[in-house]
């Protein structure tokens, strides 16, 4: 089974034990788009792991390079049928939208880390580290970063809430 399907890549595919693997830099660029679009806990966790290997600046640069080469309907994929740019060239605000990431009803939105994980094991700490990283990068490059306000979940604690 080949799981790499019609996604244009910047880097050669690596083969390990007869399994084709997408290069980490291609994954990083695609994860930025995924985090901006759907923003699951797994997306943000994966990005923090990738930023342990490559800087956020490098991943963002790879994304911009991808979008300069692969924009248009002929480069559409199952994730982006029209092949449109992500909108992350000058505005990184979508990378701070955690409103969907806190919805734990969906199994695909849960990040379960092992004891040896190199990223924060609590969601609030992971959220804070990622936001700080994006904010610092945006400021250093003169990019916009103004994430939407967070949805507040009120719990009934007998106080009329």
Region locations from a protein language model:
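Structured mid-to-C-terminal alpha-helical surface segments
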Residues: 1-39, 45, 52-161
């Amino acid at each position: 089974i080949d799981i790499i399907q019609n996604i244009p890549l910047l880097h050669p595919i690596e083969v390990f034990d007869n399994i084709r693997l997408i290069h980490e830099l291609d994954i990083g660029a695609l994860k930025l788009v995924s985090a901006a679009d759907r923003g699951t806990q797994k997306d943000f966790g994966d990005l923090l792991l990738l930023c342990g290997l490559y800087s956020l600046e490098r991943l963002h640069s790879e994304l911009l390079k991808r979008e300069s080469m692969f924009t248009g309907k002929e480069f559409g994929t199952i994730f982006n049928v029209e092949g449109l740019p992500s909108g992350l060239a000058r505005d990184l605000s979508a990378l701070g939208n955690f409103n969907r990431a806190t919805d734990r009803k969906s199994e695909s939105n849960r990040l379960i880390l092992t004891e040896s994980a190199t990223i924060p094991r609590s969601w609030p700490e992971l959220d804070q580290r990622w936001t700080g990283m994006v904010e610092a990068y945006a400021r250093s490059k003169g990019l916009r970063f103004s994430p939407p306000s967070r949805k507040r979940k009120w719990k009934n604690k007998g106080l009329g809430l």
